[in-house]
């Protein structure tokens, strides 16, 4: 379930790889540290699948693995994970504000965050923030 191909986005990984990075970011914020087993539990993937994905992300310089097996994001991995997480949170908030139930809003935001252009996302963010300010 983790592939890297010629048609990938500029950062060089597909949606599944981006989901791993975002999950590492979230788990680190929540727990302070992250290991492969934590990813497997959180994402409900098998340990071998997570191990393969983690090694690909390490080879691509998105994460580091220390001698005790703890995962950390590289500067590039951190930047990408933060960008994805920002998109996820904002899109979820927008959908919920429009009356979409929380579960559907989060699921759809997770799908869209990977394919929406930077230009389009920035316009949504501008619009959302402007409307929030107008309501205060």
Regions found by a protein language model. Give the residues of each.
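C-terminal regulatory/oligomerization modules of transcriptional regulators
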Residues: 3, 8, 107-136
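Arg/Lys-rich, alpha-helical DNA-contact motif
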Residues: 85-118
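Basic, amphipathic "hinge/linker" alpha-helix immediately C-terminal to the N-terminal HTH DNA-binding motif
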Residues: 69-87
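Residues within the alpha-helical elements of helix-turn-helix
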Residues: 42, 80, 97
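Canonical helix-turn-helix DNA-binding module
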Residues: 36-67
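N-terminal helix-turn-helix DNA-binding core of bacterial DNA-binding proteins
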Residues: 12-45
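DNA-binding alpha-helical recognition surfaces that contact promoter or target DNA
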Residues: 22, 52, 107
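Residue-level signal for threonine
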Residues: 14, 73-74, 117
């Amino acid at each position: 379930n983790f592939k890297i191909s010629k048609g990938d986005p500029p950062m060089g990984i597909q949606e599944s790889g981006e989901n791993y990075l975002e999950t590492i970011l979230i788990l680190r914020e929540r727990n302070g540290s992250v290991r492969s087993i934590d990813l497997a539990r959180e994402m409900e993937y098998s340990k071998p699948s997570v191990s393969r994905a983690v090694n690909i992300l390490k080879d691509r310089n998105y994460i580091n693995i220390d001698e005790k097996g703890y995962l950390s994001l590289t500067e590039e991995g951190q930047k990408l994970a933060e960008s994805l997480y920002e998109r996820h949170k904002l899109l979820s908030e927008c959908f919920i504000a429009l009356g979409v139930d929380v579960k559907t809003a989060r699921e759809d935001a997770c799908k869209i965050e990977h394919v929406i252009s930077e230009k389009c996302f920035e316009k949504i963010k501008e619009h959302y923030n402007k409307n929030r300010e107008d309501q205060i």
